[in-house]
Every structure is written in structure tokens, then in C-alpha cells.
């Protein structure tokens, strides 16, 4: 048995950006992992939530958005047009990611909620604009949701991993 994985070993093995296993003490033995940092929350003007929820949070190189809608930031309103909502949603996603230092290239997973099945086609049109390389698109899961407020018919959230080794901070 590899001693790094022994049950009495209180270390955490972390994979570094160079692909090397890095042994860090576990908090159970009083150690502090130097690769971890505290969570940072970011709000984005025009894309705030009514509840005390940030637009995006980041710990180290991991980024997670809250719900991203198709709000038009110039008016603060959701467009009635489905295509406009989808386009604004992806534009807002780009802006929100940027607030935490991420880009669309850093995104590894997107979850999309749609009110009706035919909205998927509009999401797909904007999806290939945001992620044009078919060999480098994030995973995506699309689900139906019928409790949107007002004229909202689409919303997403995303997870991203920033490549710190490449100088993205």
C-alpha cells in the first residue's frame, strides 16, 4: 500500500498545476494548507441579487457563479425576447466571470435552466458563440424549470478553474 494513502496519514494530497502531487498537512493535525485561501465574493453592478448573494465567489483558482440571468444591465430589466435573454445571459456570464478573474476559457461546467424545451435552440446558438471550439467546450447540463419570476425564461450558473500557472490570477 502506498504510504501516502495510509489511513493514519493526516495529509491531503493536492495536485499542483504542474501535475505533481503536493503533500499538505490536514487541519486535523493543526497544519494549514498553504495552497488554500479564504473565499472571496464579488458583486457586479447591474447584476446583483435581491438576496444577500454575491454574483460570483472564488477560493484559490476555483470560481463559482450564482444564478446568471439575461438582465439588460443598461435598463435593469429582463428582455421579453427569448433570443435577447439568451444573448444577455452569456454576456452577463462573461462579465461575472471577469469580476473574479476568470474567462470563458476557464469554465469547466455550466448548468442552464430553461422554461420551455424550444428555448434550448436559442441557448445553443449563444453557446457556440461563447464556446466556439467544439474540442474545448465545458460540460453542460440543461434542465427545465417552471418557476421563473416575471418574463425570465432562462438562467445559468458556471464553475471555472483558473490556470494560475499560466499567469491568470
Describe the role of every protein-language-model region.
Residues 10-13, 26-91, 95-108, 114-169:
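N-terminal presequence-like segments and the immediate start of the first folded domain
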Residues 1-7, 11, 16-17, 24:
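Low-acidity, Ser/Thr- and Arg-rich intrinsically disordered low-complexity segments
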